[in-house]
């Protein structure tokens, strides 16, 4: 999980730079952490989907695939977009050129990493994010998979007990299928990961140091 900058700390494209750095850092330590450097995937939701998508289109350390849930990719269509663009660019006044630059669809090419996209037809916040990505990818003949579920608001996350936070409104067995569907797609796209008898102690140790895991997290072998 990447704790990227938000609000005023997001100026000058800080979130984009941070996810790019994170991917590079993981690849640098791939052997030490028993990670396949060619099976790194970004996954993001809403604004996080924007960051995860930007990593694949704009970064120097591109992921091998991307999984996007109800991503915010067409910023000119979102409420408060001028403020968002000012934050990202660090400018007091956003120009049309700035607006087009942060609209990630303008950066899709035939070399874009494969992408899996999930969204709902009832999403009122980012209603037109998923379909245009699929259309762009189709235009370039690039690998993608798209799932539009009929029901559900913006922000379903996993749509199960893990992310529902006790709210029945955030439970939806239909939308919850996106996770397994994305895993199946990743296996078809990147191949299934090879599991061995390696221990994750070093990875867990570093994740504790970075604050991504609690200090008492157990060091278990990869199954």
Regions found by a protein language model. Give the residues of each.
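Alpha/beta-hydrolase-fold catalytic nucleophile elbow
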Residues: 3, 43, 67-70, 118, ...
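Alpha/beta-hydrolase active-site loop
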Residues: 10-31, 177-180
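Short beta-strand/loop motif that positions the catalytic acidic residue
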Residues: 111, 116-119
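Acidic beta-to-alpha connecting loop that harbors the catalytic carboxylate
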Residues: 120-124, 151-153
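C-terminal catalytic histidine-bearing segment of alpha/beta-hydrolase fold enzymes
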Residues: 138-223
């Amino acid at each position: 999980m990447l704790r990227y900058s938000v609000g005023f700390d997001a100026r000058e494209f800080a979130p984009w730079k941070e996810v790019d750095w994170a991917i590079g850092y993981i690849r640098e330590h791939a052997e030490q952490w028993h990670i396949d450097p060619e099976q790194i995937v970004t996954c993001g939701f809403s604004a996080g989907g924007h960051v995860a998508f930007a990593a694949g289109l704009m970064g120097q350390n591109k992921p091998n695939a991307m999984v996007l849930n109800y991503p915010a990719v067409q910023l000119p269509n979102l409420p408060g977009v001028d403020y968002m663009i000012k934050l990202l660019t660090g400018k007091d006044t956003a120009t049309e050129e700035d607006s087009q630059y942060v609209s990630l669809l303008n950066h899709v090419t035939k070399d874009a990493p494969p992408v899996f996209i999930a969204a709902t037809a009832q999403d009122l916040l980012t209603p037109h994010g998923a379909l245009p990505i699929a259309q762009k990818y189709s235009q370039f003949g690039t690998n993608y998979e798209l799932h539009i579920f009929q029901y559900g608001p913006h922000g379903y996350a996993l749509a199960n007990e893990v992310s529902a936070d006790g709210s029945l409104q955030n439970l939806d067995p239909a939308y919850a299928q996106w996770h397994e569907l994305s895993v199946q797609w990743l296996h078809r796209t990147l191949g299934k990961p090879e599991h061995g008898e390696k221990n994750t102690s070093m990875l867990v140790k570093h994740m504790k140091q970075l604050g991504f895991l609690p200090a008492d997290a157990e060091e278990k072998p990869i199954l």
